[in-house]
Amino acid sequence: MENNSTKKALELRELPSILTREEMVDIMQREVYGYIPKVDFTMSVSDSEYVYGGYKCNSVEHSYVTMTISVGDKSHSFRVDRLLHKDGKKRPTVILNNFHRIYESRYFPIEEMTEYEADFITVCYTDVSSDDGDFTNGLAPLLLPNGRDTDTTCGKIGIWAWANMRL
């Protein structure tokens, strides 16, 4: 509950009006991250491959699928690991860009993370596109065939976000 002194203090600051979500997204894309590309694409997902089912007292299974994105005659595939509870209940799902593939990581806290009753979808960000200025590998040449050709073209964060929105 706002008291009168707080309300007066805010009025004295003459703050601008609050922007809409769309206006804020536009500002963040224009000034910080760049615009995420709009491309016509097709997507396919392989059948699930079982990895291990013994997490959290055998209630969480680790599996993966291979996702393929195609734009025109070019395509790129990457592995998407899934940590899903076996009971089939709908749960919150966390999408996680990971620095390592789960099966390569010496420590990935699966037990601790799934303790909070969420499922996890994770991808190693370098499988989507490398973390550098090279726009010729991974999804980069499909989404940005001309590389970063303007100041408002997204970089790798935008490419990773584009992929995450499709997981």
Name the predicted role of every residue range:
Residues 54-83, 140-159:
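Short secondary-structure boundary segments
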Residues 33, 41, 77-78, 93, ...:
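Aromatic-enriched hydrophobic runs in primary sequence
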Residues 90-167:
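Cap/lid segment of the alpha/beta-hydrolase catalytic domain
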Residues 74-78, 83-94, 115-116:
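Proline/glycine-enriched tight loop/beta-turn segments at coil->beta junctions
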Residues 69-73, 84-86, 98-101, 127:
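Short, flexible loop/turn elements at secondary-structure junctions
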Residues 1-77:
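N-terminal targeting or regulatory segments adjacent to alpha/beta-hydrolase or S9 domains
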